């Protein structure tokens, strides 16, 4: 069964790899790619999405840029992780096509309205665009099957001691999304920190004789630099955003629990924290399926097998 998806991203190395993973599988039908500010400034994340789709020869997918800043706050970017371009490392082509002359919210609404089946939203950056869509198009809520997002943590954060980056950038947007009543799958740091790519995994990818695999290997080479800092305690580099796509393709790779999740929007110390009620202490109804465990080897195999799809037949088919 095919699933219609809209990818809302802020590329970003792991966003780019999530996009590459998704487009290798015909069961996932990409209706649109929209972008937000986050890993880099909004102009760079939009350009990066266009560059990746150009690399994949997928100029048929409509692309639109979204919000240039959070709902109520100043923008924070993660250029210390992703470099000056947001996709430092490989030599990527310049875009061969242009974005739509409408906003991300307008493109998402258009595609959801026209879709013949419910649509799954896959945001892998701050949730600003998704919040704006939900707030301005309540009539479309019934056509949104699920929101599969990368963000949050039941445990410690990675941008502050309490908060994961995507939620911290726009906690008010996250609050709207988690209160929407739409089914949510939360791929937070608890699971994405288990999705580490090791040096030997990168070499498996580099051994695949196609340009997309080579690009991913070079993305990972750069991504590893930041994550080698001993403070993280990582052996490899965590591939946060591809966990969303992996869950859509192979949910059996993950351990999950339905929980109530609230967003802290006020505290000076814990702003952006995702408060995950794992032990049902609040008595509130669960509003998210939270991922906690991962078969790492199965995850890596899925990525490697998916990259083998990008042979000349695929890349020249359009």
Swiss-Prot record:
Hydrolyzes cytidine or uridine to ribose and cytosine or uracil, respectively. Pfam families: IU_nuc_hydro. It comes from Shewanella baltica (strain OS155 / ATCC BAA-1091). Its EC number is 3.2.-.-. InterPro entries: I/U_nuclsd_hydro_CS (IPR015910), Inosine/uridine_hydrolase_dom (IPR001910), IUNH (IPR023186), Pyrim_hydro_RihA (IPR022975), Ribo_hydro-like (IPR036452). It is an enzyme of class 3 (hydrolase). One of its GO terms (molecular function) is uridine nucleosidase activity. GO terms for biological process: nucleobase-containing small molecule interconversion; purine nucleoside catabolic process; pyrimidine nucleobase metabolic process. Belongs to the IUNH family. RihA subfamily. The active site is at 240. It comes from the Bacteria. GO terms for cellular component: cytosol. This is Pyrimidine-specific ribonucleoside hydrolase RihA. Keywords: Glycosidase, Hydrolase.
């Amino acid at each position: 069964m095919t699933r219609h998806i809209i990818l809302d991203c802020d590329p970003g190395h792991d966003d780019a790899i999530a996009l590459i993973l998704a487009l290798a599988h015909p069961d996932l039908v990409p209706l649109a790619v929209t972008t937000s500010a986050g890993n880099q400034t909004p102009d760079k994340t939009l350009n990066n999405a266009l560059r990746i789709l150009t690399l994949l020869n997928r100029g048929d997918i409509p692309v639109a840029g979204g919000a240039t800043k959070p709902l109520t706050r100043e923008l924070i970017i993660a250029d210390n992780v992703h470099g000056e371009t947001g996709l430092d490392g490989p030599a990527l082509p310049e875009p061969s096509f242009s974005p739509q002359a409408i906003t991300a919210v307008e493109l998402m609404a258009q595609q959801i309205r026209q879709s013949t089946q419910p649509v799954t939203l896959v945001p892998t950056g701050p949730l600003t665009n998704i919040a704006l869509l939900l707030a301005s198009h309540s009539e479309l809520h019934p056509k949104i099957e699920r929101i599969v997002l990368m963000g949050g943590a039941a445990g410690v954060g990675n941008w502050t001691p309490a908060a994961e980056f995507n939620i911290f950038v726009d906690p008010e947007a996250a609050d709207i999304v988690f209160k929407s009543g739409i089914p949510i799958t939360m791929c937070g740091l608890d699971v994405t920190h288990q999705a580490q790519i090791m040096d030997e995994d990168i070499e498996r990818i580099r051994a695949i004789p196609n340009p997309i695999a080579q690009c991913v290997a070079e993305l990972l080479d750069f991504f590893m630099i930041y994550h080698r800092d001993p403070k993280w305690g990582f052996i490899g580099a965590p591939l946060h955003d591809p966990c969303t796509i992996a869950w859509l393709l192979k949910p059996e790779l993950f351990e999950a629990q339905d929980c109530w999740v609230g967003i802290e929007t006020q505290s000076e110390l814990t702003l952006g924290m995702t408060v995950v009620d794992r032990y049902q202490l609040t008595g509130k109804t669960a509003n998210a399926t939270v991922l906690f465990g991962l078969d790492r080897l199965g995850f890596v195999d899925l990525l490697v097998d998916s990259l083998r799809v990008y042979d000349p037949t695929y890349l020249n088919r359009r």
